[in-house]
Structure formats: structure tokens, C-alpha cells
Amino acid sequence: MGNSKLSKEEKEEIIKKTKYTPEDIEQLIKDFKVAAASDKKSGFSQEEFIKFFKVRFSNWDEASMVRMFTLFDSDGNGVIDVKEFITALYLMAKAPTLDKLGFFFDLFDSDKSGYLEREEVDKLVNIVVCCGKGLGYSINDAIDYAVSITSCRHIADYQKGMSREEFIKSASQSENFVKVICFYESPCMQLY
């Protein structure tokens, strides 16, 4: 559980950047130690991370979970430390909607081109449909919510695909899309 401590400065930095209280931070550190202890290695392995988040994102496929792990492993060392873990929980649960949508775009921009190409949009639509079904929306409604934000009218250069800015602008204007992916202030599922 090596990387399970934060310096006083790191705690203060996290408190400034998030809505977490000092008590929240302490509880998150305790929970991190428990969740990251299963393989006796330092930090949160990819397997532990996926196990932890798969419960909360049961409709997500393995490749998307691996991509999420990679995005949160900010130092690229293959292990999520406590600071990266707290950041992940904040982004998924308490961050402003625009930040969450930016993360969602990055999650599906698998080639890091800055654009969502057709295959990436298809994966995004599939996740939205699965999330929508899990929340009781009809398949048609969930498809409509996803397709409405990724339609050609929102894309300046159709050859390149949908840019990050275009995605965030379009998605943030669709209350239904935001609800389906659980990125509204009162989350539909507890991440933490």
C-alpha cells in the first residue's frame, strides 16, 4: 500500500481543487488502503481499479475501464496512488459537469487525436445506450440522446470528427444526455 499517504501540502492542494473536506480526504485515504490492499502491492493495480469501478459502472466494457485507468494513472507508472484515486473519485462524482464531459471525451478519444472519429463515437453511443437501459430509459431514447449530440450539425469538420470543444458544447446542452451518463449534480449512482 506504499503510495497511500498524502503530505499536508498535497491534502491542502486537493481540498482547494475539490469539494472534499479534510474529513472526506481522511476517509478516502482509509478506503484507498482497504481497496488497494488485495494484491499486497503499492497502490491500486489496474485489476483493483477495474474491480472497484466496475461495480459502479457495470455497463462499461473492459476496454473502457482500462482506458479510464490509463487516464487516471497520471504519472504512467501502472499504479494508481492515493492522490490519483482521490482525483478519479472527485472527477466522477463531484466535479463540474463540463470537467466530467471533458474527461468523458478523453476516455473515448482512444487515439488522442483531439477528435472523436466514427469508431470512437460508436463506442460512446454503445456506452450511453447501456447506461440508459440500466436507468430504465428505452433503447430508442438512449440512442436518440447519444446521437443527438454527435450528429453532423455539431461537427465543423466531418472528415476529422467531433472535436473536444464541439463535444463538450453539444453534450452540455443536452440535459437528457447528461442524465443518462450520470453527470448531473445528484448522481444516479453512488461512486463513493
From Swiss-Prot:
Binding, Ca(2+) 2: D109, D111, S113, Y115, E120
EF-hand domain segment(s): 60-95, 96-131
An example Gene Ontology biological process: regulation of signal transduction
Binding, Ca(2+) 1: D73, D75, N77, E84
One Pfam family linked to the record: EF-hand_1
Single Gene Ontology MF annotation: calcium ion binding
Keywords from the UniProt entry: Calcium, Metal-binding, Repeat
Family indicated by similarity: Belongs to the recoverin family.
Name by which UniProt lists this protein: Calcium-binding protein K
Protein's organism: Dictyostelium discoideum (Social amoeba)
Gene that produces this protein: cbpK
